[in-house]
Amino acid sequence: MHTIRCLILSALSVAGAAQAQGSQDAAPAGRQPVGSVASPGLEMPGLRLSPGLRVRKLTEDQMPAFMEADDMSGEPSAELLLKGNAQVRRVDGVIKGDSIHYDDATSEVEVKGNARILRDATLVTGPSARINLNTYSGDIDKPNFWIGASGGTARAEHADIFSRSQMRLTDVYYSGCPCEKPSWYIKATSLDLDVDENEGVARNGVLYFKDVPILASPYLTFPIRKERKSGFLLPTYGTSSKTGLDISVPYYFNLAPNYDATLISRYMGKRGLQLGGDFRYLGYSYAGSVSGTYLPNDRDAGFDRYMYRLTHKQYLGSGFYTDWDISGVSDDNYYRDMTTLGLNTASTTYLPRQGRVGWSSNYWQTYVQVYKYRTLQDPDAPIVPPYDKEPEIFLQGARYDWNGFDVRMDSTAVRFRRPLFLGNRIGQEGERLEAYPTIAYPIVRAGWYFTPKAGLNYTQYHTSWFNQDWNRLGSLAPYRGTESRTLPIVSLDTGMTFERPTTLFGKDSTQTLEPRLYYLRVPYRNQSALPVYDTSLADFSFEQAFQENIYTGGWDRIANANQLTVGLTTRWLDASTGFQRVALSAAQRLYFEDQRVTLPGETPRENVRSDFLVGASAALTDTLTTDLAAQYNPYDNNWSRGLVSARWTPQRQTTLALAYRYQRDPISNISYAPRGQNQVTLAFQWPFTQRWYGVGRVDYAIRSDTGGVVGASDSARVTQAIAGLEYKGDCCWTGRVVFQRYAVAANDANTAVFFQLELTGLGALGTDPLKLLDKSIPGYQPVSQPTPAGTTFERYE
């Protein structure tokens, strides 16, 4: 038996070819203007492109059809009957069957026996089918679908195809699960699929999991591909000691490619029905969002609760830009009572209200901003609110490598205002003007550098002192309305790097030795009469040891200094890859004069040497890493602070992390000094079997901060506990249950339970704990891997 092949060209395509040939014959090449019919942008003297070869998109009725069968009868220009391994093939699809009847006048194809239609990687099979090649409309009896773009499958009693992208299935079974035996599926009386709109609409649909119905809806929508679409998202649910039963039903609006919105109805068993939403937008030069919630008459609190936040960033052109971040809540306890499941927003203490307009160029940048705070007070641990900046003006000019010099100037002008604290005015108010020009001359060579630097800091204050300040600070005489300070600051920074080949753990390595010296000279100026707005004592660390001031913030205090910082670092690097295996560091300051400048209540330093700083990090193996950072007091032989951590990751989705943090109590009880801390943290993700995984984290405060921080307590307590199980089913689903308990105030905690059923190809039912696990467990990896999106090249015949 011989296979017969036939090519059918439409009348229009044949006429077009004839017209092109006629044009070619009528215009000899020698008389045709050069490039007159060439494609745009193509000019080659002496050559031209024949109109018959010009590339243009064919319409549906111009596409040629290729036919093949064991037996073929009829007229190609009228009707053809193909029998035995029959197929009709065009560039946009293939139709196969036992027999095919083709009508050239209407482009109708009728398939009988083992109908098989393939287009854009979507395959449809059935006992019979009718299809129009031009409109791609028709119908199929008892079809089976394999949707290439999503990997989904479907079967139905009947399918009506309306166009290339739209069809309706009757009495349908659908699943987006790529497994051979899907674990979940949807049954519906009808299912409308719109590929262009990326939407599937099931009517009278029931979602089954393991053949058990778990969700029913008269109207259910879902995406066909992994793209955005408008419609209801899967509901989230959980339980919390603050909200009770917590159910959220979001509706997503895919308004445009560059902006969208989500409307969320949230029911809380203890509080009532809350309405929330957010709107996001993104443009070529701007981006922002608007979000908020409203709960009328909270059943537990007895009044209305709300939250809002507006963010925006925009480039205005010519170097100008603007941004703002404005947020607010109805009351101080909003986040403690209404925290979203999986997101510990209960620790939110300050809400920013900031707006800024700025400009920048190659060497200059400036901005004007208003920066205010809403302080959310914990009645069991009240804190003094920070100063508002109303406004702040910043100007910076910088030129680097300017004939070898680095020149920079920073200046600010700020007006400070402080909100009332417990109905009282705490602290002074006023304006501060600061200018700090510096010049440096870096000398950098292979293996060493030397950088001298000099600057002059000028600060002026206009202060309004109040009776509360006079009573607290003492005599009125030293505190004038206007004060100024001028201080020269000089430093020398130098370092070297030595290298040598060596071995580490039997492997070739390169060891470096990196000594560093930093000398700082700042003369003494009496600053006791200056106010303190936004300055605090900086933590002593490797970074701070090589800084110009022991205070951080706005430099309301600049400490006198005649000191030398000595640092030494050594590293072991893999000789072939450069990967750092081990690093050891140490540093100490040597003081040549006593400290005379202090913050109010601070005890001045009299020691001639600082604490020792030591640090170490090691990748002992490819799976085990350790880190250590500590501060040791050589005078009383005690540790001032320390952090020791280790992480073991023997394989994918397996990690164990352990950390210990220690902070010694400050010598004096001053508000700006960090409180003592003694805390152990254990976090893990561990497979119990091939399918069962355990996750967890415990933060245990042996003795924690009592300085007014949210969740603080002087007694031992568990500040956070997370425990959960993950079950990795087949390729279709993953189940999770996670328990979380965390501090929301000094004497209060919240308990939450998360349930989630993740269905591949559909979405997830329940509250998503993945953000919580990713943030809380170092090295966490989801047990369910994302399924890559299908393409039009997924299947070819």
Swiss-Prot record:
Biological process per Gene Ontology, one example term: lipopolysaccharide transport
Region annotation (Disordered) ranges: 23-45
Pfam families (alphabetical): LptD (PF04453)
Entry superkingdom: Bacteria
Signal peptide residues on this chain, from the entry's feature table: 1-20
Compartment annotation: Cell outer membrane
InterPro entries, per database record: LipoPS_assembly_LptD, LptD, LptD_C
Role noted for this protein: Together with LptE, is involved in the assembly of lipopolysaccharide (LPS) at the surface of the outer membrane.
Family note: Belongs to the LptD family.
This protein's name: LPS-assembly protein LptD
Source species: Bordetella avium (strain 197N)
Gene that this polypeptide is encoded by: lptD
